[in-house]
């Protein structure tokens, strides 16, 4: 099972000091956090994509390319790539280039985002959000799998004899996750292609997550990709830890109370009860995270949000040290609980091996027929 972190890249005032980091400071902090993730033994770092204040990650592949040059093992991903407003040709080329730079340590999570104004900023109509996601991904899927593409759709100029460059590393496109909070159409899309489904459930109760994941698993099997338990699932989460729960709650409360993303909603106690947010001791985080399997089934990727709400870099790095200490326990416990036949999360190496096996099998069949 893969464990990692994702960032939304918010620039938020620290309510305990009144200081707001500059964009430059926040960007540099994100890079340090990503490198720290590898140092403490995590598997994945993912960044969102935003084009409006107070967020800074407007160019995920630029950021991930820098991180790739300074890490050796970490899988580099997005927690949202805006399939609705980005040109699929540019996505195809940018992430193939990143594949080559990172020696395959790349996957990508498609999503529609949660900022309605981004549509007109990029010349699109929000009322066409789902059709855009469906059509643009269909083109991207083809661009990565065909050397020469002819294409005509509703939302972009036609392509004739087009080849996106560079081609995917080893002829293997990045593994794709489809991220969704509430859109069943995106779960359907992930199932149709046999891709991964990431339910970013950080603000949602368990029963909603259960329904979304169950839908994806059911449709994954419907489209003939395998049994429901073989579908590739990822979940989000939020944690804040200290050695004892009282200190964790006391320290995190002002960040929860003042962060725009939480402000004016339920209390910290209600929010932790209703969503995956866990504020407490390391053991409480372990126990709570293990319960995710009860409503989502066996799953392959767990990403935590840890660097938000104005938390200073020093605190986030301390949190990562603590996460690095509990992840081995989570790996062991999840592995012991996992049912037979549940696959691991795909990686570039596993996808390349599967492609080679398929090629060898085809060659053997051809030889037999001759």
Where are these regions (language model features)?
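Internal, glycine-rich beta/alpha segment that forms the wall or movable "lid"
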Residues: 16, 87-195, 210, 214, ...
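N-terminal beta1-alpha1-beta2 module of alpha/beta enzyme domains
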Residues: 1-75, 342-345, 355, 369
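An alpha-helical appendage that flanks or caps ligand/catalytic pockets
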Residues: 5, 130-164, 207-300, 306, ...
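Conserved, mostly hydrophobic/aromatic
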Residues: 3, 41, 49, 67, ...
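Glycine-rich, proline-tolerant flexible connector loops at the mouths of alpha/beta enzymes
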Residues: 44-67, 82, 114, 201-204, ...
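Active-site mouth loops of central-metabolism enzymes
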Residues: 14-27, 81-89, 172-182, 274-281
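Short, acidic/polar
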Residues: 25-36, 94, 181-188, 285-291
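Hydrophobic faces of well-ordered beta-strands that scaffold small-molecule active sites
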Residues: 3-7, 45-47, 76-78, 106-110, ...
